[in-house]
A protein has these predicted regions:
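Intrinsically disordered, low-complexity segments enriched in Ser/Pro/Gly/Ala and basic residues
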Residues: 1, 8-11, 30, 35, ...
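C-terminal interaction-tip segments
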Residues: 2-16, 37, 112-128
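Intrinsic disorder/low-complexity segments enriched in polar/charged and small flexible residues
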Residues: 7, 23-25, 42-44, 85, ...
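Solvent-exposed, conformationally flexible loop/turn segments
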Residues: 10-22, 37, 81-87, 101
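Intrinsically disordered, low-complexity segments enriched in proline/serine/threonine
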Residues: 19-20, 29, 67, 102-105, ...
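Beta-rich globular "head" domains
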Residues: 21-64, 119-124
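Terminal beta-strand-rich extracellular "head" domains
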Residues: 47-109
Length: 128
């Protein structure tokens, strides 16, 4: 069983300001729920247009995004030095024990001098 939500490349872009944790916006908002309880592998794939001067891009899955119950999990920092002006597909994955009442989202942070842009983006939950 798996669920996939995606924004096609070229349909809608999202600017991510530097040095500010920002929730990635997928087609129905910033959070998604699974159909049944269990262990789910969450995967996100982002098409990132890099600006100048960055050295790190951080990504983390979060349970209960946008609420006081926020609980981060599955973090991964990527070295983006030398990627100025380039466009890359990047992905993150993490296994989360969750049920239909628990929303999950993904947020990112970067240290570039100006916003980076997300073009195509998708989030998938696959039951293990």
């Amino acid at each position: 069983v798996s669920n996939l939500w995606k924004v096609e490349s070229g349909k809608s872009k999202q600017a991510i300001p530097p040095k500010a944790w920002t929730w990635v916006e997928y087609p129905k908002g910033i959070s998604y729920k699974v159909d049944s309880a269990g262990e789910w592998e969450w995967i996100t794939i982002l098409l990132v247009e890099f600006s100048a001067g960055g050295s790190v891009l951080r990504g983390r899955f979060g349970r209960y995004p946008g609420t006081e119950k926020l609980d981060e999990t599955g973090h991964d920092d990527k070295n983006i030095g030398g990627w100025d002006g380039k466009v890359y597909h990047l992905h993150w994955a993490h296994t989360i024990k969750c049920d239909p009442s628990m929303p999950v989202g993904f947020w990112i942070w970067h240290d570039s001098k100006s916003p980076i842009v997300l073009d195509g983006r998708q989030i998938k939950a696959k039951k293990l």
